[in-house]
Amino acid sequence: MLIKKVELVKTAFKPGDYPEPVKREVAFAGRSNVGKSTLLNTLFQRKLAHTSSKPGKTRSINFYLVNSKYYFVDLPGYGFASASKQELARWKELIEDYFSTRDNLNLVTILMDSRHPMQKNDYKMLEWIKDYSIPFIVVLTKTDKLSGNELKKMIQIYEKELKLWGSPPIIPFSAKTRRGLNELLKILIP
């Protein structure tokens, strides 16, 4: 399935400021600078989500209408160390409200950097998703920066860690080489 049409339809800075929950939603979550916006732009086949080399650029929840059928939802990155405690609390409130109020949220796509093991904030995100009983998949980003053996080793580490959360699908992805793109699209747009 291809993404033929996409548009940013809503940017939410506060809880409840979302579009009507009438379309299937897929949320994208991950640490700051893990490549959420880059992944979305690769899926969209154009630069619609703003990318930056500075972590913490996405500070709102952005709703993209895809093929007039689905919302792809870009969540703020978590774990950005230089954000103020007040801003971190606001982001936490925004994401918790989103998870707890969106009955049409069918899947969370958690992005993790393939070069590093899971971090404390990744575990917190997994606990949130578990608490809300939301299905999820894991996308390992930046796989082009690892050798084949290094990637294989990291996938094994992630598989072992994720057994505690029901062994979700793990998709190795690279925006540069487009590795994993077709596999991901099959899951996101059934």
UniProtKB/Swiss-Prot annotation:
Gene Ontology terms: cellular component: cytosol
Classification via InterPro entries: G_ENGB_dom, GTP-bd, GTP-bd_ribosome_bio_YsxC, P-loop_NTPase, Small_GTP-bd
Gene Ontology annotations of biological process type: division septum assembly
Cofactor(s) required for function per UniProt: Mg(2+)
Positions of GTP binding: 30-37, 56-60, 74-77, 141-144, 173-175
UniProt keywords, alphabetically: Cell cycle, Cell division, GTP-binding, Magnesium, Metal-binding, Nucleotide-binding, Septation
Lineage: superkingdom: Bacteria
Stored Pfam families: MMR_HSR1
Recorded GO MF terms: GTP binding; metal ion binding
Chain positions recorded as Mg(2+) binding sites: 37, 58
Family: Belongs to the TRAFAC class TrmE-Era-EngA-EngB-Septin-like GTPase superfamily. EngB GTPase family.
HAMAP family given in the database record: GTPase_EngB (MF_00321)
Purpose: Necessary for normal cell division and for the maintenance of normal septation.
Name of protein: Probable GTP-binding protein EngB
Species the sequence originates in: Kosmotoga olearia (strain ATCC BAA-1733 / DSM 21960 / TBF 19.5.1)
